[in-house]
């Protein structure tokens, strides 16, 4: 459908990074097929994430925690390592997605928040290490104005002011509009 709508070449590949899998081999297969099909890698975007949201920290199982850490943090780690030589060659870009959930400790999102905060840290390190190779590494940390964020602002105005800056548009996105 993307090929038809936008006139671009698409390469669908199933690749599950999870506990118990040979993740390095899974990721290398994706990289090899990508190079075979397109000849180069200019951009890596790490956005996939699964988690057991809604489960409290006290009730979280190791399997639920692993789901988030493997599908988010480990996936970003494996893909970044595998893409590094190609991105170095093309002076490419990495865009990793984190989340406001990690910034504010959303109830019921312990594994998701942990994975996303890990991705933010990994991204900072890569930006510092890979900048010398002309690889641009950034993290996108979406944050929408929600009732929970409003409650945080009211309960902790100093922390809110120190950590949440007004976007350039002058307002926050709203998940409903």
Language model regions located:
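Substrate-binding pocket helix/loop in short-chain dehydrogenase/reductase
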Residues: 55-57, 61-66, 160-163
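Active-site loop-to-helix junction immediately N-terminal to the catalytic Tyr of the SDR YXXXK motif
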Residues: 60, 105-113, 125
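Active-site helix of classical SDR
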Residues: 80, 115, 123
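Alpha-helical segment proximal to the catalytic Tyr-Lys
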Residues: 85, 128-132
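Residue(s) in the substrate-gating loop at a strand-loop-helix junction
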Residues: 99
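A glycine/serine/threonine-rich, flexible loop-to-helix segment
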Residues: 132, 142-167
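A conserved structural motif in NAD(P)-dependent oxidoreductases
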Residues: 167-177
């Amino acid at each position: 459908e993307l090929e038809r709508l936008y006139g671009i070449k698409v390469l669908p590949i199933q690749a599950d990074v999870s506990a118990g899998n040979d993740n390095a081999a899974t990721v290398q297969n994706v990289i090899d097929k990508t190079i075979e099909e397109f000849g180069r890698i200019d951009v890596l975007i790490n956005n996939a994430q699964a988690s057991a949201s809604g489960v409290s920290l006290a009730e979280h199982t190791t399997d639920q925690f692993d789901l988030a850490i493997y599908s988010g943090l480990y996936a970003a780690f494996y893909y970044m390592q595998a893409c590094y030589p190609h991105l170095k060659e093309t002076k490419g870009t990495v865009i990793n997605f984190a989340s406001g959930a990690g910034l504010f400790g959303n109830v019921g999102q312990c594994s998701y928040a942990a994975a996303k905060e890990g991705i933010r840290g990994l991204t900072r390190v890569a930006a510092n290490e890979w900048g010398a190779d002309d690889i641009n590494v950034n993290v996108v940390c979406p944050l929408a104005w929600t009732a929970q964020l409003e409650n945080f602002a009211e309960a902790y105005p100093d922390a809110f002011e120190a950590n949440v800056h007004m976007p350039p548009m002058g307002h926050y996105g709203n998940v409903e509009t």
